[in-house]
Amino acid sequence: MSYEFDENFDVIVVGAGHAGVEASLAAARMGCKVLLATINLEMLAFMPCNPSIGGSAKGIVVREIDALGGEMGKNIDKTYIQMKMLNTGKGPAVRALRAQADKALYAMTMKHTVERQENLTLRQSMVDEILVEDSKVVGVRTATNQKYGAKAVVVTTGTALRGEIIIGDLKYSSGPNNSLASVTLADNLKELGLEIGRFKTGTPPRVKASSINYEETEIQPGDEKPNHFSFLSKDEDYLQDQIPCWLTYTNQESHDIINNNLHRAPMFSGIVKGVGPRYCPSIEDKIVRFADKNRHQLFLEPEGRETEEVYVQGLSTSLPEDVQKELIHSIKGLEKAEMIRTGYAIEYDIVLPHQLRATLETKLISGLFTAGQTNGTSGYEEAAGQGLVAGINAALKVQGKPELILKRSDAYIGVMIDDLVTKGTLEPYRLLTSRAEYRLILRHDNADMRLTPIGREVGLVDDERWNIFKIKKNQFDRELTRLSKEKLKPIKETNEKIQALGFKPLTDAMTAKEFMRRPEIDYATATQFVGPAAEDLDAKVIELLETEIKYEGYINKALDQVAKMKRMEEKKIPENIDWDAIDSIATEARQKFKKINPETIGQASRISGVNPADISILMVYLEGNNKARRKVD
C-alpha cells in the first residue's frame, strides 16, 4: 500500500516523556528533520511519580546521558531544589548523585529547550498507527487522520499504552496523571506482530506541606559541597538555599490498617493483573512480603518551590481513598495532614524487549525503534538513556551511517539495553549497580572520559562541550604522567615529614603515583612532597586522579575482562542462522536462541539457560560454515 503524506520528516518520535525528549533532541541535533508528537504538550518531560532525578546507578546514567550530549543533566541542574551525593561512605563504584526536582519547573524548562531546538517540530497529536510497507516503517497516522512520512519512528509512549488507573475498586482508561490513554496504537503494535506484555506501577498520595507537623520528623538536608549532573555546570551556580526533605516511618497502627483492608486492595483482590516493580513495591505489598518489619521508611519530598504538594516516598498504593486517608493519619508528623492527591496504580502495555536489537530497533520492522517504559523499564533515567540511544540510532539509520551500540563495558546504559534485549524482563526493570560487572570502570566521575568521544563521533557533542572535555582530559593526562615520574626517596628529611603527618615512613624509593596508592594518602598530601601541578587543576580532575590511581589494580583487572569479552562480541552470528541445523545443542538453549536471535557470541553467552557447552558447539558450527564459505569463494 502506498500512502500520501501531509508532511514528511526524517524521524518521528511518538510520546514526549523523558525518553521522547532525549530521542527527538538527539536526532534533531544530529541534523535530522524531526517531529515530536505527544498527546498533551503540558505533559512534556512531566514527572508523574517521584519528583527526583538520579540515585543509585540512575545518577550515573544521567551523567552518561550528559557526557553523550543529552539534555537531562543540564535540565535538572537548572531546576533542582536539593542535591545530594549518595553512598559517600562506600567505594567510588557505587557513589551517585540524586536531586530533588522542582517538577513543574523541570518540565517547563525542558519544554522551552524542545521548542527552541532547530530541526524539531513539536505537535500535540495522538498517533494511532505506525505505517509500514514491506516490513519497513514509512510514517504514522494520527487520530485526526493526518499522515506523516518518516524514515524512522521512535515509540516512547511510557505508561499511556492502553493505560488504566486503579484506585480501590475503581478502574478507568487513563495515561499517567489522568492524561489520555493510547489504546488504538496499542492495538496497532499488536497487529504489526509485536509481542506485547502488561506491567503495573504506582504512585503514592501527595499531602499539603502546611498540614505536616515537621517537628515529629527527621530533617534530610542537601549537600553544601557543590555537585552537578552536567559536566558543563559551574560550581559558582550551585544552589545555596536548598529545600530539605523529611524522614518519618510507618508503625504498627499503619500496618494494621493495611492488613485489615487487604480484601479491598486491588493488588490482592484480583483487579490488578499487570506485574509490578520488585524494587519499588506498593506499601501494601511491603507489609505482606516483609511481615517481620515493624516499620518502613517514608521520605516527605517537596514537589517544588511554588507548590504545597509533598510526595510521600515509600507509600505507593492503590488502596481505596478512605483507607489512604486513614493510613496517612496513622503516621508520625502526618496525623493532621491533608491529602491533596490520591495514590494510584497504573497498568499499561509494553513491547517485550527481547524483540529489539541493541540499537533499540525492532527486529521485525526496519526503522521502528522503541524506548523507555514502552520497553518494560521503570524510572525517568532509564527511559532517558534509552531514548537517547534510540534517537541517535534513528538518526544514524536515516543518514546511512554505522549504528551505535553501547557495550556493557561502555556505560550503565549499555548494561541496561543488553539486559533487556538479551534476557528480556518479566517485571519493570530497574538499573542497579549490582547488574554491572564492570562497575569500577562505569563510575560517576569518569562518564565523560568514557562517552564524550563517542558523542562527538556521532555528531551530538558540540564544540563548547568538546573543548571543555579536552581541557579536562589534557589536565588529567599531564598530571598522571608527572605523578608517574616524580619520585620520593627514603631520606631522613622526607621520612620525618611523612611521620609528622602520622604516616609510615618510606623504606624504598617510589613515585608519587605509588605513594598515592596508600589508602591514607590523597592528592593534596602527595603534592606536599613533589610540588603542585604546573597549572591549577579542577577539583573534578583531582577526584578522578585519586580514584584512578588508588584503584588501578582493580581497574586493570576489569579492563582485562573487557578485552576478553570484546573478542566474543566481535564474533557475529548471521541473522538468517538456522538454529535447528546445529546438532547437539541443548533444547533449552535452542529455544532461547530462536526467541532472542542473538547478534554476537557474547550476547548468546549471556542468555539465561545457555551453558558454556552450548556456546562451544555454536562457535564450532559457525567456524565450520565460515570455512565452507571461504572454500566456495
UniProtKB/Swiss-Prot annotation:
Gene Ontology molecular-function annotations: flavin adenine dinucleotide binding
Subcellular locations according to the entry: Cytoplasm
Cofactor(s) recorded for this entry are: FAD
Which annotated residues bind FAD? G15, A16, G17, H18, A19, G20, V127, S182, Q373
InterPro entries referenced in this protein's UniProt entry, alphabetically = FAD/NAD-bd_sf, GIDA_C_N, MnmG, MnmG-rel, MnmG-rel_CS, MnmG_C, MnmG_C_subdom, MnmG_C_subdom_sf
What is this protein for, i.e. what is its function?
Answer: NAD-binding protein involved in the addition of a carboxymethylaminomethyl (cmnm) group at the wobble position (U34) of certain tRNAs, forming tRNA-cmnm(5)s(2)U34.
Describe the subunit structure.
Homodimer. Heterotetramer of two MnmE and two MnmG subunits.
Q: What is this protein called?
A: tRNA uridine 5-carboxymethylaminomethyl modification enzyme MnmG
- From what organism does this protein derive? Streptococcus thermophilus (strain ATCC BAA-250 / LMG 18311)
Q: What is the lineage of its organism?
A: Bacteria, Bacillati, Bacillota, Bacilli, Lactobacillales
